[in-house]
Regions:
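Hydrophobic alpha-helical segments
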Residues: 252-254, 384-492
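N-terminal leader/propeptide and maturation segments of large enzyme subunits in energy/redox metabolism
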Residues: 94-129, 133-145, 286, 342-343, ...
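Substrate-recognition/specificity elements adjacent to catalytic centers across diverse enzyme folds
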Residues: 26-239, 247-249, 254-262, 267, ...
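Proteins synthesized as precursors that undergo proteolytic processing into mature forms
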Residues: 359-387, 394-395, 465-520
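Short, solvent-exposed cationic patches
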Residues: 68-93, 294-301, 420-431, 435, ...
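Acidic, low-complexity N-terminal propeptides/linkers enriched in Ser/Thr/Asp/Gly that mediate export
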Residues: 125-229, 234-235, 382, 394-398, ...
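Gram-negative bacterial Sec-dependent N-terminal signal peptides
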Residues: 2-21
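Glycine- and hydrophobic-rich flexible loops that cap the catalytic core of alpha/beta enzyme folds
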Residues: 249, 253-260, 266-271, 275-419
């Protein structure tokens, strides 16, 4: 029987025209390769002159097969890295240092559980997961030069480990230091040193992850068509830009996170969707009172003593000699969730959404929505916990949706801190109905926005009212980018795609509009005899004359950013301890002396690193892509491109998260604006877009860096959505495997 199967497989291999097959092909079960070859014949991939894949399949499953194959062509290492992360298997590639990261994921992700969930999935979804695995395995089979670090074969159920396309999942809120202290030997509460280190990391200046989304109603556009800004702020090269279509009605264009078979932020012929990381509080900690009785563990819940669940978890890791070793853990769980740390004599359980099947359904089905009603019907799956949505369609509808997975809780409790797990009143009480969250549709002002700020300014004066909702609907408040978005969206009622781009790249830095006057006041109040008065006179004159706008030539931007970072370092820790806004603390709570000391520090650092405190911002702030590594090494001696826009922390809508790296004086960006698109929903959808660097992760490809200058300039290019738009812009037509 087995010999017969091998003979059939050998015959199939011999019949294949095209590249030599890898050993992966020979290890597949008999029939898999033949099935994959047959699917490939129903798929067409067209690469445009930017290297972007336009994938067409007869069925949705065929399209998924081609979509994931094309992604693998562009950057298989990032696909594998994402699944190693989400399966809890990173340590098998990176070694023992990643064990705690993997254990954190494995508290939720269990391969046997995912396989069972796959078996119970709707038939249509199983077909897509099967096609996804086939596409990746066929890529590996036809590319013998590609050597996976770990995942030499993909199984359909693995797709359920990575169902939501945002940059950081809820699970990442679990402290690795606290987790190691609890599950290490001996078990203990995290040390003061660990907590201090993690606190310092939490308050350090860094680029906020998230996104900008604007939806403009027809009443505020020149041509009477709804417009949408799609502007995710992620780590660079985190997503693939592509189009995926089928004869079954699939036709989605936009950004897909590497390894996923749905367009996460994008549009189809009728609707567009933009997700922004939400400030809603949907992740909670419950402090459990643990007792040992008869050698078993119990936790208090009301008048009950409930047994603590245990589960054995083995985490494999790559040893120094290259072999695989394992660490074994006994993990603990209550009905609230897994235990992730100890604090104040209690064990802390972590509660978050875990609905992988529904999440994958929702992520795919919304790409086929034809209007707001059908989009909202998909949202009723309530499997999105972490993202707001800005929506627009060709009916002229615009909308803002808060996340749909929002546990109903007793608002008397402060869920920003661990609540008493023994008190049933603190438990989750089901989920809120969509109508109970701050959603908006077609507000009279004609625009909607979110920039990872609260929902209570989403539509200017027509926004939801904070008093109407529980406290946990927002945990951040307003932000400099939110204030900036309101400013640009309120400024006109005749938006077009070009003017929407102008708004998205408006150079005003709202945070400094509040901060610089406090610095001026501190300086003006300084006695004339104080040495700082004369030393900082030129710097203050420059900042007082500044228009608060970034540009590559602006020396004031450099000085203001360096001053802001220095003052942040003096403010953030205490602001966090007091639960205060860092910006408010910087403006109101730092002393005049601290403000001036920070300015002197900024001036000195500019002079030391660049020879003059009057250094243009573009000389410092650079985009560099010199290799295809997931974690890049930057080098001042290598070519780079000046970027005029600044950090979103200062209110820049076009965000560029940059800093110094070991051995560099210049700042290099690694996050912020990544994929940017503007879309007009007229009789024919029209879109312009740009991606950081280029579509390919291969440094030898001409599409590795071909969009870099456009990215820095904010010069979006046409997105070829219709076949006639591709005419004259096609580099290659082929089928997978050719």
């Amino acid at each position: 029987m087995r010999i017969g199967k091998l003979l059939l497989l050998s015959a199939a291999c011999a019949a294949l025209s095209g590249p030599a097959l890898s050993s992966t092909a020979l290890t597949q079960p008999a029939g898999d390769l033949a099935r994959q070859q047959a699917t490939a014949q129903r798929v067409q991939i067209t690469r445009d002159d930017w290297g972007i894949a336009h994938v067409h399949g007869k069925s949705d499953a065929d399209a998924v097969f081609g979509m994931i194959y094309a992604q693998a062509e562009d950057d298989f290492p990032r696909i594998e890295a994402n699944y190693l992360t989400n399966l809890g298997r990173t340590a098998e590639a990176e070694g023992e240092k990643a064990v705690w990261q993997d254990l954190r994921m494995r508290l939720f992700v269990d391969p046997a559980d995912l396989q069972a969930r796959y078996d119970r999935s709707p038939a249509w979804l199983k077909v897509l997961m099967d096609a996804w695995a086939d596409g990746l395995n066929y890529y590996l089979a036809t590319h013998p030069d590609v050597k996976p670090k770990v995942l030499t074969r993909f199984e359909p159920w693995m797709a359920l480990s990575f169902t939501e396309g945002s940059i950081g999942g809820d699970v990442e809120r679990i402290s690795l230091g606290e987790l190691e202290a609890f599950y290490g030997k001996p078990r203990m509460q995290a040390s003061a040193e660990v907590r201090a280190r993690e606190f310092a990391q939490a308050v350090a200046f860094r680029e906020p992850t998230g996104s900008n989304g604007f939806a403009i109603a027809p009443s505020n556009t020149k041509d009477g068509h709804a417009l949408l800004l799609i502007n995710p702020h992620t780590s660079f090269f985190f997503r693939s830009e592509l189009q995926v279509t089928s004869d079954a009605g699939l036709n989605a264009y936009g950004a897909a996170t590497w390894g996923q078979f749905f367009v996460y932020q994008g549009f189809n012929a009728h609707t567009g969707w933009m997700h922004t990381s939400s400030t809603v509080d949907v992740v909670d900690e419950f402090a459990e009172t643990i007792q040992s009785q008869g050698g078993k563990l119990f936790y208090k819940y009301g008048a009950e003593q409930r047994p603590v669940e245990t589960r054995a978890v083995e985490v494999a890791y790559r040893a120094a000699d290259g072999s695989l070793a394992k660490k074994s853990f006994t993990t603990y769980r209550t009905h609230h969730g897994p235990i992730v740390r100890a604090a104040d004599g209690k064990w802390v359980a972590f509660a978050m959404m875990y609905k992988p099947v529904e999440a994958l359904e929702q992520s795919f089905l919304r790409t086929k929505a034809v209007d707001y009603a059908s989009f909202l019907k998909v949202a009723e799956l309530k499997a999105n916990s972490s993202n707001n949505t800005l929506f627009a369609d060709d009916k002229g509808e615009v909308a803002y949706l808060h996340p749909q997975f929002i546990p109903r809780r007793d608002d008397r409790f402060d869920y920003t801190k661990p609540v008493d797990g023994a008190n049933p009143a603190a438990d989750w009480k089901g989920l809120h109905a969509l109508s109970e969250a701050p959603h908006l549709k077609n507000p009279p002002n004609g625009w909607l926005m979110n920039t990872n700020n609260w929902p209570y300014s989403a539509a200017g004066p027509y926004s939801p009212k904070q008093a109407d909702y529980p406290r946990y609907m927002d945990s951040v408040g307003e932000t400099p980018r939110g204030i900036h978005a309101t400013r640009v969206l309120s400024a006109r009622k005749d938006f077009t795609l070009p003017t929407l781009i102008q708004a998205a790249y408006d150079p005003y830095l709202t945070a400094f509009a509040d901060l610089i006057p406090t610095l001026s006041k501190a300086y003006d109040a300084t006695p004339d005899g104080d040495p700082a008065k004369a030393r900082l006179a030129a710097q203050m004159a420059a900042l007082k004359a500044w228009d608060l706008k970034w540009s590559a030539d602006s020396t004031q931007t450099s000085l203001a950013v360096f001053w802001g970072e220095a003052l942040w370092a003096r403010s953030a820790a205490q602001a966090k301890k007091e639960g205060a806004s860092v910006y408010k603390y910087m403006a109101e709570r730092t002393t005049p002396a601290q403000k001036l000391e920070a300015l002197a520090e900024a001036s000195d650092r500019l002079s030391a690193d660049f020879g003059d405190w009057r250094t243009p911002w573009g000389t410092i702030n650079r985009f560099q892509r010199n290799d295809g590594a997931i974690v890049q090494t930057f080098d001042d001696a290598k070519a780079s491109i000046p970027v005029p826009f600044a950090s979103g922390q200062w209110g820049s809508l076009a965000s560029f998260g940059a800093k110094r790296y070991p051995g560099t004086k210049k700042y290099y960006g690694t996050s912020g604006n990544s994929f940017v698109a503007v879309v007009e929903f007229g009789p024919r959808v029209k879109a312009l877009a740009v991606s950081a660097g280029g579509e390919s992760g291969d440094p030898t490809s001409k599409h590795f860096l071909d969009q870099a200058q456009r990215y820095a300039d904010g010069a979006l290019r046409p997105a070829y959505f219709y076949p006639d738009q591709l005419t004259g812009h096609v580099e290659r037509n082929y089928r997978p495997g050719e």
